[in-house]
Amino acid sequence: MQIFPQTNELIWTIINFAVLLWGMHRFLYKPLLGAIQAREDEINANLKKAAEDRAEAERLRREFEAQIANAQREAQEIINKAVKNATAVKEQIEAEARARAAEILEQATQTIEREKAKAVAELRREVADLAVAVAGKVIEKSLDDAEHRRLADSFVTEVTKH
């Protein structure tokens, strides 16, 4: 008596199933695992490359930021030097202008003094000439008081004209 009436069929089904599993394992599972492993390796390589690229990008960003900071510092130094040079040039121009103004003022003062001295000398010469002329007139005439007064007034008027 058989426990299962179709035991032969069951055994052949189990054998067929085992052969199918073995074939699938040999021809499908291993290549599928290889493809999955290759894909996993590719993804891991891509992730590793992305991490390396990210690290390189971060390094470049820091390097560029350092270069920008350096360029800004150099630009500020150039600006500071330009301002310092401009201030020095301004101070030099102002000093030269003050010196030139003092020189012009000194020359003008000297010219005024010379002209004043000339005018005083000329006035003295004219006064002396007039005094000599008046003395000559006085000597020529004998003057009374009224004539003397008129002559003095004439002398003063002539002096004030010149």
UniProtKB/Swiss-Prot annotation:
Spans traversing the lipid bilayer: 10-29
Record InterPro entries: ATP_synth_B-like_membr_sf, ATP_synth_b/b'su_bac/chlpt, ATP_synth_F0_bsu_bac, ATP_synthase_B_chain
Topology in membrane: Single-pass membrane protein
Entry keyword annotation includes Transport: yes
MF GO annotations: proton-transporting ATP synthase activity, rotational mechanism; proton-transporting ATPase activity, rotational mechanism
GO CC term (a single one): plasma membrane
Subcellular location: Cell membrane
Domain of life the protein comes from: Bacteria
Keyword line: ATP synthesis, Cell membrane, CF(0), Hydrogen ion transport, Ion transport, Membrane, Transmembrane, Transmembrane helix, Transport
SUPFAM superfamilies referenced in this protein's UniProt entry, alphabetically: F1F0 ATP synthase subunit B, membrane domain
NCBIfam families attached to this UniProt entry: ATP_synt_b
Record's function text: F(1)F(0) ATP synthase produces ATP from ADP in the presence of a proton or sodium gradient. F-type ATPases consist of two structural domains, F(1) containing the extramembraneous catalytic core and F(0) containing the membrane proton channel, linked together by a central stalk and a peripheral stalk. During catalysis, ATP synthesis in the catalytic domain of F(1) is coupled via a rotary mechanism of the central stalk subunits to proton translocation.
Subunit annotation: F-type ATPases have 2 components, F(1) - the catalytic core - and F(0) - the membrane proton channel. F(1) has five subunits: alpha(3), beta(3), gamma(1), delta(1), epsilon(1). F(0) has three main subunits: a(1), b(2) and c(10-14). The alpha and beta chains form an alternating ring which encloses part of the gamma chain. F(1) is attached to F(0) by a central stalk formed by the gamma and epsilon chains, while a peripheral stalk is formed by the delta and b chains.
UniProt similarity note: Belongs to the ATPase B chain family.
Identification of the protein by name: ATP synthase subunit b
UniProt source species: Symbiobacterium thermophilum (strain DSM 24528 / JCM 14929 / IAM 14863 / T)
